[in-house]
Amino acid sequence: MDKNLTLLTDFYELTMMNGYLQNGMADKVAVFDLFFRQGNESTFCIACGLEQAIDYIKNISFGKEEIEYLRSLGTFGEDFLSRLAGFKFKGDVRALPEGTVVFPNEPLMVIKGSVFEAQLLEAALLNIVNFQTLIATKAARVVRAARGRGVLEFGLRRAQAPDAAVYGARAAVIGGCVGTSNVLASMLFDTDPKGTHAHSWIMSFDDELSAFRAYAELYPTNCLLLIDTYDTLKSGLPNAITVFRELKEKGY
């Protein structure tokens, strides 16, 4: 998770910035609102991603490597590259706290600054905030549907790369999940990891009940059992009930 995401932007942001400079408009004050329109499945969203958005803004820096790469494109003059070398966002950021319920056309973030500076932020902020807000909102809807029962986040293996897995887990917890199976995310964001066991655990034993009992013996106070390895209703659920009754008899 690179702290310097300066070039995490669409090329047209840079060509527009250069255009502002060449037309004497670079210092013109601009205001950008980050918002969403009417959703298809929900009338609200859960704001998320602000912490990473602020980290991104604070760490913007066009170093030698970035400048040399942009110079190699043959698109930009030295006056533009020189200004990028000294780039530091000096504008204002207003935003809703993470976890806030947000409605269509209500800004999650408002960026005010010179159009030269503010333009650069567009693509990265949309990437950061849109993804985490999407996950937090979906998590909130699932949690509401669960009606008070705890919901865990197990999305690591289906996430779109490691960063998405970590920040997706974070967003899910902000959206109301009680925990995540992602150990790295748990460490980074100071939560306790949660989880069951894999089908491979069950299949490593002679039978499902023996596997459940072995797991329960190891983790009696934190025992979650996966019941769909063979037959959920005919074996998984009855065997799990048997093991949990045995734990109860032992005082757990």
Please provide the spans of the model-predicted regions.
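Acidic, glycine-rich loop-and-beta core segments that form the ion-binding/anion-interacting portion
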Residues: 210-252
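Ordered alpha/beta subdomains of enzyme catalytic regions
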Residues: 1-219, 246-249
